[in-house]
Protein backbone atom coordinates (compact mmCIF):
# COMPACT_ATOMS: atom_id res chain seq x y z
CA UNK A 1 0.00 0.00 0.00
CA UNK A 2 2.76 2.45 0.87
CA UNK A 3 4.41 2.00 -2.50
CA UNK A 4 1.41 2.10 -4.86
CA UNK A 5 -1.96 2.81 -3.21
CA UNK A 6 -4.05 5.94 -3.58
CA UNK A 7 -6.79 4.76 -1.21
CA UNK A 8 -6.55 2.22 1.61
CA UNK A 9 -9.54 0.80 3.46
CA UNK A 10 -8.53 -0.16 6.98
CA UNK A 11 -11.08 -2.70 8.12
CA UNK A 12 -11.58 -4.94 11.14
CA UNK A 13 -9.88 -8.31 10.94
CA UNK A 14 -11.86 -11.22 9.60
CA UNK A 15 -11.18 -14.86 10.12
CA UNK A 16 -12.60 -18.26 10.85
CA UNK A 17 -15.10 -17.69 8.05
CA UNK A 18 -16.69 -14.76 9.89
CA UNK A 19 -16.71 -11.01 9.43
CA UNK A 20 -16.60 -8.50 12.28
CA UNK A 21 -20.39 -8.40 12.59
CA UNK A 22 -20.40 -12.10 13.45
CA UNK A 23 -17.17 -12.23 15.45
CA UNK A 24 -17.68 -10.43 18.77
CA UNK A 25 -14.13 -10.91 20.10
CA UNK A 26 -12.60 -9.50 16.89
CA UNK A 27 -15.05 -6.60 16.97
CA UNK A 28 -14.13 -5.71 20.55
CA UNK A 29 -10.38 -6.01 19.87
CA UNK A 30 -10.50 -3.55 16.95
CA UNK A 31 -10.46 -0.34 18.99
CA UNK A 32 -9.71 3.25 18.03
CA UNK A 33 -6.21 2.74 19.44
CA UNK A 34 -5.68 -0.29 17.17
CA UNK A 35 -6.92 1.76 14.21
CA UNK A 36 -4.52 4.58 15.10
CA UNK A 37 -1.66 2.06 15.36
CA UNK A 38 -2.44 0.73 11.89
CA UNK A 39 -2.52 4.25 10.47
CA UNK A 40 0.80 5.03 12.19
CA UNK A 41 2.28 1.89 10.60
CA UNK A 42 1.04 3.00 7.19
CA UNK A 43 2.60 6.43 7.78
CA UNK A 44 5.91 4.77 8.71
CA UNK A 45 5.86 2.76 5.47
CA UNK A 46 4.94 5.87 3.46
CA UNK A 47 7.87 7.71 5.04
CA UNK A 48 10.17 4.82 4.07
CA UNK A 49 8.93 5.11 0.47
CA UNK A 50 9.39 8.90 0.52
CA UNK A 51 5.70 9.39 -0.21
CA UNK A 52 3.68 12.12 1.47
CA UNK A 53 1.30 10.76 4.09
CA UNK A 54 -1.50 12.63 2.35
CA UNK A 55 -0.89 10.64 -0.85
CA UNK A 56 -3.01 7.75 0.48
CA UNK A 57 -6.60 8.50 1.40
CA UNK A 58 -8.04 6.39 4.19
CA UNK A 59 -11.32 4.54 4.19
CA UNK A 60 -13.05 2.29 6.67
CA UNK A 61 -15.78 -0.29 7.08
CA UNK A 62 -18.52 0.26 9.64
CA UNK A 63 -21.92 -0.98 10.64
CA UNK A 64 -24.26 2.00 10.37
CA UNK A 65 -27.45 2.26 12.42
CA UNK A 66 -29.29 5.59 12.53
CA UNK A 67 -32.41 6.45 14.48
CA UNK A 68 -34.25 9.66 15.21
CA UNK A 69 -34.42 8.57 18.86
CA UNK A 70 -31.52 9.14 21.26
CA UNK A 71 -30.71 5.91 23.10
CA UNK A 72 -33.06 3.98 20.81
CA UNK A 73 -33.64 0.46 22.22
CA UNK A 74 -33.14 -0.98 18.72
CA UNK A 75 -29.67 0.58 18.50
CA UNK A 76 -28.90 -0.61 22.04
CA UNK A 77 -29.78 -4.16 20.94
CA UNK A 78 -27.59 -3.88 17.83
CA UNK A 79 -24.67 -2.70 19.99
CA UNK A 80 -25.12 -5.68 22.31
CA UNK A 81 -25.34 -8.08 19.33
CA UNK A 82 -21.94 -6.77 18.21
CA UNK A 83 -20.55 -7.60 21.66
CA UNK A 84 -20.55 -4.14 23.24
CA UNK A 85 -22.00 -3.58 26.70
CA UNK A 86 -23.98 -0.54 25.56
CA UNK A 87 -24.60 1.89 22.70
CA UNK A 88 -22.03 4.41 23.93
CA UNK A 89 -19.28 1.78 23.82
CA UNK A 90 -20.26 0.89 20.24
CA UNK A 91 -20.28 4.56 19.25
CA UNK A 92 -16.64 4.81 20.37
CA UNK A 93 -15.59 1.87 18.21
CA UNK A 94 -14.23 2.24 14.68
CA UNK A 95 -16.52 -0.58 13.51
CA UNK A 96 -19.75 1.32 14.19
CA UNK A 97 -21.44 4.55 13.16
CA UNK A 98 -24.53 4.61 15.34
CA UNK A 99 -26.92 7.16 16.80
CA UNK A 100 -29.11 10.01 15.66
CA UNK A 101 -28.38 11.69 12.33
CA UNK A 102 -26.63 14.53 14.19
CA UNK A 103 -24.54 12.08 16.25
CA UNK A 104 -23.50 10.09 13.18
CA UNK A 105 -22.68 13.27 11.25
CA UNK A 106 -20.54 14.54 14.14
CA UNK A 107 -18.75 11.20 14.47
CA UNK A 108 -17.96 11.00 10.75
CA UNK A 109 -16.60 14.55 10.90
CA UNK A 110 -14.60 13.81 14.07
CA UNK A 111 -13.03 10.73 12.53
CA UNK A 112 -12.23 12.68 9.38
CA UNK A 113 -10.51 15.47 11.33
CA UNK A 114 -8.80 13.43 14.07
CA UNK A 115 -7.98 10.16 12.31
CA UNK A 116 -8.05 11.06 8.63
CA UNK A 117 -10.76 8.68 7.40
CA UNK A 118 -12.43 10.16 4.33
CA UNK A 119 -14.46 7.23 3.00
CA UNK A 120 -16.66 4.51 4.45
CA UNK A 121 -18.08 1.27 3.24
CA UNK A 122 -21.14 0.80 5.41
CA UNK A 123 -23.36 -2.11 6.31
CA UNK A 124 -26.85 -0.76 6.97
CA UNK A 125 -28.27 -2.27 10.15
CA UNK A 126 -31.89 -1.16 9.98
CA UNK A 127 -34.44 -0.42 7.25
CA UNK A 128 -34.68 3.24 8.28
CA UNK A 129 -30.90 3.80 8.31
CA UNK A 130 -30.61 4.27 4.55
CA UNK A 131 -33.38 6.87 4.40
CA UNK A 132 -32.03 8.81 7.39
CA UNK A 133 -28.48 8.65 6.01
CA UNK A 134 -29.50 9.85 2.54
CA UNK A 135 -31.85 12.52 3.82
CA UNK A 136 -30.05 13.88 6.89
CA UNK A 137 -26.40 12.84 6.95
CA UNK A 138 -25.07 12.60 3.40
CA UNK A 139 -26.09 16.14 2.31
CA UNK A 140 -23.79 17.57 4.99
CA UNK A 141 -20.80 16.08 3.19
CA UNK A 142 -21.71 16.97 -0.40
State what each model feature region is:
Residues 1-142:
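Active-site-adjacent structural elements that line small-molecule/cofactor binding pockets in enzymes
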